[in-house]
Amino acid sequence: MFSVEQPRLLVHLDSTLTMHQTLIDCETLLAHLGHSDWVIFDCRFDLSDADAKERDYRAGHIPGAIYANLSRDLSGPVIPGKSGRNPLPDPESLHRRFCNWGIGPKVQVVVYDSGPGSFAARLWWSLRWLGHERVAVLEGGWKAWNSQNLPLSTEVPKPVPWRFPLQLQEGWVVDAETVLQASTNPEVRLIDGRGADRFRGENETLDPVAGHIPGARSLPSLSNVGKDGQFQDAEELRKKFEGVLAGCAVEQHISYCGSGITACHNLLAMKHAGFAAGRLYPGSWSEWITDPKRPIATGAA
């Protein structure tokens, strides 16, 4: 393991303060801007231009926010013909990166993006996977903050390294072989977070093969939020997920999508609805189709 030098002059707040683990509103974040025990991440990203949103970040962001790039910071190296489009990084490398960004054991992390929260959810899930639970996604994200004319900044912060213990959550990540076995197991539910059209095998614009993993059920992550970008009521989300799970224990379900992004949004919505943690297939559809021997289905579930 590595060590990160503990800063001597950084004063941290009372660790007994409320811990936010799923969602947080703009008013609460505004009240904590500048607090040493709060770290903000801007996760805006464009799948068609990996650098576009970082340029937007430099043009203006929530004060104190650190930019986290999906491809560079939250994904590992792509292995052509083997991995998905956004594979998970090595956990120790990812842990080191977060520590260098100033995350300590009692630090509250807030994450936002410019869309429904899928990229922010990837960082949210990643931190929880490493064992840090004090992380929440900003309700409505960048659009909600701007719509209220709240403060903006062009200053790029210089975080002071800190350290939280690495406690990797065993069993949260599954591989393609596990998914293959699950596809024929009635006690396991595969949930696909992509749009319903891509699930059916229509309008596939990101991956060279269309369709879905046999046995999966479609639950588009966009259905977790309303037109205003706010998450649906927790009880409504709970009923929706119970319908898709259809008696399957939530711990036994596996979430996937195109490359392990919108699946994290579904996992966030499940947590918001009061469910325990499910499992993630991070390689998702883009990894599944790299092996022509793996079965493919099309049409509705």
Map each language-model feature to its residues.
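Cytosolic catalytic domains that perform sulfur/thiol-centered chemistry
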Residues: 13-301
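N-terminal amphipathic/basic-hydrophobic helices that include classical n-h-c signal peptides
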Residues: 1-18
